[in-house]
């Protein structure tokens, strides 16, 4: 009798969906075509006690969401699944995301959808300005998806939002968190030099060694140059940059990154813990202890940044107004039991 042994053939991964104009691609469909593949996480590491968010007023959260939907606006808080949303919305603050909710990049750490975006909404600058006025904001953060399909990368749209917002709320400070304007830096800088925000922010996201894996389509030196060139054109405007830890970088690489940012004339820094949005996103390499974040802040102050905020829940626009005015970074929320275990509570 002959026994037939079947050869195991691994199941081929599903073919990712094609990008159709106006259709959002998330999860596997978003990251399947990046150079370094993301292996879906089977079991995520347990979050430590310092990954905590302070809850605020549910009524205020609901009020802001209703206002945003009425004006057909997006926030990065919602689209990127920011864990601080309840606290920020509860405190009456939000980061507006302009130029739609579909990004032309596929960064595996980000939860914003990828695809072929729709045309710009010509009414969005006015709607954003009306919302800022309606919420009575004194400090507004405006960010965007990447729009590699636009000749100016969306710089003119930023200008339109700034102009409309300043017209209705002249006392409101405007911070813009811009993409890298890849291939369009000069035209973007020309526009944003002429019509300047109060803070020019661009996130470098991670250390250079990890760029290919986590920022496909972006360039570390290009981001540094964008920050330095803007400061050279508008030395009166504060520049700001943020990045994540917990992706696989070393502590020494973080210090080197801070040195690079200081050498490129950045004024303010934010450093936060990377949190995996879903199993199809890049995995968390480690949860960085609050003591390590404190070392980064100590080093940043030592080398002369105007302000450096670093902590597990810090994000680029986290209490941006407080950082602008020079306040200290809020301490992470810790459990009494954990602090006792680390010997950080007195008798």
Curated annotation (Swiss-Prot):
Database matches in Pfam families: LIAS_N, Radical_SAM
SMART domains: Elp3
InterPro entries named among the record's database cross-references: Aldolase_TIM, Elp3/MiaA/NifB-like_rSAM, LIAS_N, Lipoyl_synth, rSAM
Molecular function GO labels: 4 iron, 4 sulfur cluster binding; lipoate synthase activity; metal ion binding
Record EC number: 2.8.1.8
Positions that bind [4Fe-4S] cluster 1: 77, 82, 88, 317
Protein family: Belongs to the radical SAM superfamily. Lipoyl synthase family.
Pathway: Protein modification; protein lipoylation via endogenous pathway; protein N(6)-(lipoyl)lysine from octanoyl-[acyl-carrier-protein]: step 2/2
Cofactor note: Binds 2 [4Fe-4S] clusters per subunit. One cluster is coordinated with 3 cysteines and an exchangeable S-adenosyl-L-methionine.
Domain Radical SAM core residues, every copy: 89-306
Gene Ontology CC annotation, any one: cytoplasm
Record's keyword terms, sorted: 4Fe-4S, Cytoplasm, Iron, Iron-sulfur, Metal-binding, S-adenosyl-L-methionine, Transferase
Gene3D superfamilies in alphabetical order: Aldolase class I
Organism this protein belongs to: Psychrobacter sp. (strain PRwf-1)
Lineage top rank: taxon: Bacteria
Names of the cofactor(s): [4Fe-4S] cluster
Chief place of localization: cytoplasm
Protein residues bound to [4Fe-4S] cluster 2: 103, 107, 110
Cellular localization per UniProt: Cytoplasm
Full protein name: Lipoyl synthase
Name of the top EC class for this enzyme: transferase
Record field: catalytic activity: [[Fe-S] cluster scaffold protein carrying a second [4Fe-4S](2+) cluster] + N(6)-octanoyl-L-lysyl-[protein] + 2 oxidized [2Fe-2S]-[ferredoxin] + 2 S-adenosyl-L-methionine + 4 H(+) = [[Fe-S] cluster scaffold protein] + N(6)-[(R)-dihydrolipoyl]-L-lysyl-[protein] + 4 Fe(3+) + 2 hydrogen sulfide + 2 5'-deoxyadenosine + 2 L-methionine + 2 reduced [2Fe-2S]-[ferredoxin]
